[in-house]
Amino acid sequence: YIYSADADEVLDEENREKFRYLKENLMPEVEIVQMYYGNQLSHRSVYNYDRELRPKLFKRQRSFQWIDPIHETVRLLPVVFDSDIEITHMPQGSHAGRDLAIFEDMVKREESFSKRLFTMYAKELLIAGDREKLACAEDFFTQAADGGQTAPEQMKEALCVVVRAARLRGDDLKMYRYAMKGVTDEGISEVCWELGEYYFMQKDYVEASIWYYNAAYETSSILNIHTGGDLPLMRLSECYEALGEKEQAKEYRSLAKSWT
């Protein structure tokens, strides 16, 4: 088996013992072992959850096996074992600047992005990217949003980045044009959040509250989970506070603080 390690991860004594036991008792048919990765939210990382399973141990050689008694085919999905081993992520600083610089170099060299890397780039921008980094990435994601070959999920992710970048630049027309693409069908929390932010900054608290409500209750987030949870709930509290509706403001403030 091959263990995939990061330079900033730590395995304490208890989990080293669990790992030793796992290696001694691992069944040969297991091809991937997943382990919990903890402390992910430190330093504003790209992740939405502080603890989640990740594939960490991989079988070196994997042979195909025939399955099903009729219409036989080979099994394509690996045999995965979810262990209770927990690795602690202990970065000494934020990696966002480094990661975004690598993505920017890939764009300059016109390298292709896998769906996974495309999603990671969009996540890094929405969770940790500043105004400058968003402006740098705007053309790349605009092309993706306009591209006829872009997969539906990546299209939605591109819209989230373009809408935020355009809003921060003050390009209201572009922001609104791409936002409307993102609120059709089921809608996207990130886009509703950006529209709420636009109207909030204009001090149009009634209109802003509509979009914050949509972000929190009518849509789902795809990149930053907080845009569908505590962020719009807290903004709803601020909107109702500005409108003089104290009880509503108090209720949403409580919901925001208790959101997990």
Task: Give, region by region, the residue ranges found by the protein language model.
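Short beta-strand-to-loop acidic/aromatic patch adjacent to the donor-nucleotide binding site
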Residues: 1-13
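Catalytic-site signature of metal-activated, phosphate-bearing donor transferases
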Residues: 11-132, 136, 141
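Flexible helix-coil transition and linker loops at the boundaries of alpha-helical arrays
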Residues: 107-114, 144-155, 219-226
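Structural motif corresponding to the intra-repeat A-B loop/turn of tetratricopeptide repeats
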Residues: 128-131, 169, 202, 243
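Amphipathic alpha-helical segments of tetratricopeptide repeats
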Residues: 142-146, 183-184, 215-220, 257-258
